[in-house]
Every structure is written in C-alpha cells, then in structure tokens.
C-alpha cells in the first residue's frame, strides 16, 4: 500500500511457496528501494521448505542464493536485516564506501550509466559469473524496467482474495502510453491454488 502497510497480503502458504522458488535460484535480485521500504531478509527459510524441495537440497549441501542488490546511491547500510543473514550478498554500486561490512558482503562496482546501474551490463556480469537462474523480488520500478525490456522469462504472481483499491502500489511501472493493442502480452503456463490464494505462472509472448 502507498501508506507503507504491506504485511501480509498473501497467506502463509503462499509465502512458503516463495521459499521453494528462492531455494532453486542462484541469485535473488532486488533493489535498495525494496531494502529501505521493507527491510527484508530475502533469504531461504530452510525449515519452511516442502519435503520435495528438501529432498533436492539436503541441509548438508544447501547453499543460500546470492542476494544481489542494486544500490547506485549507496543507501543500503550494515544495519539492514539482509546484511545480518547468512549467505553471500553483492551490493551493486557506482562507487564503494568505507563502512565496515561483514565478510559475506561484497561491493561490486559497475560503470556509471547516467548515474544509474546499467541493468544489461549487470545481467551480462551475472552470466559471466555462471549464474543462470535469477529470482527477482523487487518494486514497481525495477520490475517495470525488466518487463519493458523483455528480460523476463517467467512472471509469477500470487493473488489473494482481497481488493485493495487505488491506494495499492502497482505491480510495475510502464512509462510508455500503452493501448490494449500494444500492451505487454503473456500466456499462462500454470494456474494453481496455494492455500486461499492463486498462483499464476506466465511467460511473455514472443515479439
């Protein structure tokens, strides 16, 4: 919501389902805006994984996905919750700072692109780092850019049986003036009920 209220829209079952997708990913990609607004952990709650996922990732060999945070203005601080969790964290920045960071946190410097991080360059870097499965949990700005740039292979949406009205935050920002005829087009890959909620898995239609 625009007033900052965000916990919880979906059910416990839906949130547990998200853990499965996180566990199967090499990277969880987000932005400093999400860190500042929600102060999330963005980690895998291993004990909440279903039996099938646990059988794939036994505790002895399980590794948390790398949390990659786009932070062009160095807004993420050592005091944020995500920094206090286990697992690697990469802060993608235009310049490093001299603050004391834990060993699991690395500042990675990207080239300045109009005072912003070049997302295409970042994704290329991830690919060169042999990372090929990126799970994105972000706000409307980053999500909108990725969708508008056709950089998404799958879109996963959890829908709760609630109506929030015009004060709800948008899923993504689309800055072009769209008509129905040139809207972003998707096709359904899977629809299923998760507890009281619905999970949609969509893939973009080829241009």
Swiss-Prot record:
Pathway: Cofactor biosynthesis; riboflavin biosynthesis; 5-amino-6-(D-ribitylamino)uracil from GTP: step 3/4. Signal peptide: none annotated. Substrate binds at residues 6, 22, 42, 45, 137. NADP(+) binds at residues 8, 38, 72. Keywords: NADP, Oxidoreductase, Riboflavin biosynthesis. It catalyses: 5-amino-6-(5-phospho-D-ribitylamino)uracil + NADP(+) = 5-amino-6-(5-phospho-D-ribosylamino)uracil + NADPH + H(+). GO terms for biological process: riboflavin biosynthetic process. Transmembrane segments: none annotated. InterPro entries: DHFR-like_dom_sf (IPR024072), Eubact_RibD (IPR004794), RibD_C (IPR011549), RibDG_C (IPR002734), Riboflavin_Biosynth_HTPR (IPR050765). It holds the Pfam family RibD_C. GO terms for molecular function: 5-amino-6-(5-phosphoribosylamino)uracil reductase activity; diaminohydroxyphosphoribosylaminopyrimidine deaminase activity; NADP binding. Its EC number is 1.1.1.193. NCBIfam families: eubact_ribD, ribD_Cterm. Belongs to the HTP reductase family. This is 5-amino-6-(5-phosphoribosylamino)uracil reductase.
């Amino acid at each position: 919501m625009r007033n900052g209220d965000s916990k919880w829209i979906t059910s416990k079952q839906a949130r547990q389902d998200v853990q499965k997708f996180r566990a199967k990913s090499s990277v969880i990609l987000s932005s400093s805006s999400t860190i500042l607004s929600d102060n999330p952990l963005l980690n895998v709650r291993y004990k909440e994984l279903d039996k099938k996922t646990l059988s794939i990732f036994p505790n002895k060999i399980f590794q948390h996905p790398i949390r990659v945070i786009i932070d062009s203005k160095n807004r993420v601080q050592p005091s944020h919750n995500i920094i206090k969790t286990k697992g690697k964290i990469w802060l993608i920045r235009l310049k490093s700072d001299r603050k004391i960071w834990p060993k699991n946190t690395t500042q990675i410097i990207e080239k300045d692109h109009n005072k912003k991080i070049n997302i295409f360059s970042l994704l290329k870097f991830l690919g060169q780092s042999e990372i090929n499965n990126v799970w994105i949990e972000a706000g409307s700005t980053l999500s909108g850019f990725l969708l508008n740039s056709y950089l998404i292979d799958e879109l996963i949406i959890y829908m709760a049986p609630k109506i929030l009205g015009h004060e709800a935050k948008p899923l993504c920002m689309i800055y072009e003036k769209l008509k129905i005829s040139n809207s972003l087009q998707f096709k359904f890959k899977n629809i299923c009920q998760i507890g009281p909620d619905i999970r949609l898995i969509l893939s973009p239609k080829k241009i």
